[in-house]
Regions:
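N-terminal glycine/serine-rich phosphate-binding loop of ATP-dependent small-molecule kinases
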Residues: 1-101, 113, 117
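Glycine-rich phosphate-binding loop plus the immediately following alpha-helix
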Residues: 106-127
Length: 127
């Protein structure tokens, strides 16, 4: 079992981009798993964390399937790199289960007025 590999995940507005890389940084496989963004009441923009998780699980299986002929297996994955579109908290219970089914994402407009007031006293470029 030679080689160590990294899987990178990028949680975006329209879906998850996932890629598998070797130690030199060469991309060996890439794919996108789409999930919905829920838009309602004009300013509400939300996603379901469960959709994110399912996309990560599905993309991992698909990536490993794509490189199966290169004899790359899950035991050779040494690291995960994860980035996302939002600085969002997901409230969890003591057992690690989400307390809400949907969370706001970066484009949600409900706090527009609060943001405006914040930047009246804080430099936007310094933020």
């Amino acid at each position: 079992m030679q080689g160590k590999y990294v899987i990178a995940y990028d949680l975006g507005t329209g879906g998850l981009k996932a890629s598998l890389h070797d130690a030199s940084g060469t991309t060996l496989a890439f794919l996108v798993c789409e999930y919905p963004t829920l838009y309602y009441k004009e300013v509400f923009h939300e996603q379901r964390p469960e959709d994110w998780w399912q996309a990560i699980c599905r993309s991992t299986r698909l990536l490993l399937d794509k490189v199966k002929e290169q004899n790359i297996c899950k035991e050779q994955i040494c690291a995960l790199a994860i980035s996302g579109h939002s600085l969002v908290g997901i409230p969890m219970d003591r057992e690690g289960r989400p307390l809400v089914g949907q969370v706001p994402i970066w484009s949600d407009g409900r706090a527009k007025e609060q943001a405006r007031r914040f930047f009246e006293t804080h430099d936007y470029n310094a933020w």
